[in-house]
UniProtKB/Swiss-Prot annotation:
Expressed in roots, cotyledons, leaves, flowers and siliques. Residues 20-52, 67-191 are annotated as: Disordered. It is found in: Nucleus; Cytoplasm. Phosphorylated in vivo. The keyword DNA damage does not apply. Interacts with protein phosphatase 1. Interacts with TOPP1, SRK2D/SNRK2.2, SRK2I/SNRK2.3, SRK2E/SNRK2.6, SRK2C/SNRK2.8 and PYL11. Residues 20-31, 114-136 have a biased composition (Basic and acidic residues). GO terms for cellular component: cytoplasm; nucleus. This is Protein phosphatase inhibitor 2. Residues 93-109 have a biased composition (Acidic residues). It comes from Arabidopsis thaliana.
């Protein structure tokens, strides 16, 4: 027998026939396909546009009428609930807020004070980060920190730095030694 050529596949056809005969019978689906109905205009021609422009304008007018009715109902129910509860609950002292749409009041409502506080905290947080970044890039951050350390430890201790590494504007304080009469410690401090 000759050796098969490299890169060619030889099929064992007897094995394939045996596998096909042992396969289980599968159920055939006899359900008809879903029919497709293209959109058609009133005149019978195919068109990608579903409705006429006038019908859309009518829908917009109906939507505006519905919004007005809902706003009136919401305003009257809020007036009734504030009068019936003896002044308890939410009530507005401003004339403008009372005349505004109730739907708009939901968006601006009672969360505005909370939202303002959140924005103030967020602004302060990012400003603090920006200030630290500026101080680090100018190097004055480390000078201020050393002055604070000197003032806090008093006259008995002296702060010395072993080494500073500058790489891409980022300064790290590797080790700080505190020298005093009885104790000395060395601990890495990253900023």
């Amino acid at each position: 027998m000759t050796e098969p050529k490299r890169g060619r596949v030889q099929w064992d056809e007897a094995n394939i026939v045996e596998i096909e005969s042992n396969k289980p019978v599968r159920q055939k689906i006899t359900e008809p396909k879903t029919p497709y109905h293209p959109m058609m205009d009133d005149d019978g021609s195919l068109s990608p546009r579903g409705r006429a422009f006038d019908e859309c304008v009518d829908d917009m007018q109906r939507a505006e009428e519905l919004r007005n009715v809902l706003n009136d109902a919401a305003a009257s129910s809020s007036r009734n609930s504030s009068q019936g509860s003896g002044g308890g609950g939410w009530s507005s002292s401003d004339e403008e807020e009372e005349e505004a749409d109730p739907m708009d009041q939901d968006e601006e409502g009672s969360g505005s004070g909370k939202n303002e506080r959140f924005n103030a905290h967020r602004k302060a947080h990012y400003d603090e980060f920006r200030k630290v970044k500026e101080l680090r890039s100018s190097g004055s951050f480390y000078e201020e920190e050393e002055e604070e350390d000197d003032g806090a430890k008093g006259s008995k201790s002296e702060t010395t730095t072993n080494s500073r590494h500058t790489k891409g504007g980022n300064k790290e304080l590797d080790a700080t030694k505190t020298v005093s009469g009885t104790s000395s410690s060395s601990s890495p401090e990253l900023i």
